[in-house]
Amino acid sequence: MEREECSSSESGWTTYISSRMEEEEEEVIDEVYYEGHIIEKDRRKYANEYEINKDSDDSMASDASSGPSYHQTSNRGKRREGLALRNGKGESNDVYSHRIDDKNIGNLISRKKEKKKSENKSRSHKKK
């Protein structure tokens, strides 16, 4: 027979026992919590990079022959790289996948809200 490991602590006359299952649930909750912070950190990083790259510094250009600065197109290149290498391990891929995940989460929340509204409407019609 396999023994389940338990930890215990005493308080007065009562002994409290916590099982491994409760500890595993706490670990899962911690993982979800920290994963949310990582996603938010990546989202802010992407937003900051976008803000930096969208403004170009063409003030040094003296005539039309100098043309636009090259860093204007660098943001597009990163986005294309993210789309082309979806299964790769690049940083832009992580940003891309988080944007898609965030969009899907938003859609899921919207669908749940719509479902709840329709359920409430059907309940109110049944009561009348």
UniProtKB/Swiss-Prot annotation:
GO terms for cellular component: cytoplasm; nucleus. Residues 8-18 have a biased composition (Polar residues). A motif (Nuclear localization signal) lies at residues 111-118. A motif (SOFL-A) lies at residues 11-16. It comes from the Eukaryota. Expressed in seedlings, roots, flowers and siliques. A motif (SOFL-B) lies at residues 59-68. Residues 80-104 have a biased composition (Basic and acidic residues). Keywords: Cytokinin biosynthesis, Cytokinin signaling pathway, Cytoplasm, Nucleus. It is found in: Cytoplasm; Nucleus. GO terms for biological process: cytokinin biosynthetic process; cytokinin metabolic process; cytokinin-activated signaling pathway. Its main location: cytoplasm. Residues 1-26, 54-128 are annotated as: Disordered. Involved in cytokinin-mediated development. Belongs to the SOFL plant protein family. Domains SOFL-A and SOFL-B are required for function in cytokinin-mediated development. This is Protein SOB FIVE-LIKE 3. It comes from Arabidopsis thaliana (Mouse-ear cress). The lineage of its organism: Eukaryota, Viridiplantae, Streptophyta, Embryophyta, Tracheophyta. The gene is SOFL3.
